[in-house]
Amino acid sequence: MTDKPRKRRKRRNDRNHLVYKLTCAVDGSFYIGITFVDKGKKEKSLDRRWRAHLRNALDYGKENLLSVAIRTHTPESFTQEILHVVRGKQACHDLERELIQELRPHLNM
């Protein structure tokens, strides 16, 4: 058996990432988060991340503020919004941190 050369994976820090906002229509509280853009499909990537938040809240019973808000107000009361598309993981983390400090979202605390 011959060893095949391994394909190099694309570095994750070179991908596009999203900074997104989840807003509860009931009380106006919101959450700022990030996720990577999968195959250039921004909305699909945000939907994938939203489903992960729902699993954490509804299936796994997580106790973070976002999960508690999802259980309290129902998933239908939340809207999703893409705020920025950023090239690179670190740049996206930096922007997320800045927005959280600036906007003080209740569900991130």
Question: What are these model-derived regions, one by one?
Answer:
Residues 2-109:
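Structure-specific nucleic-acid interaction/processing domains
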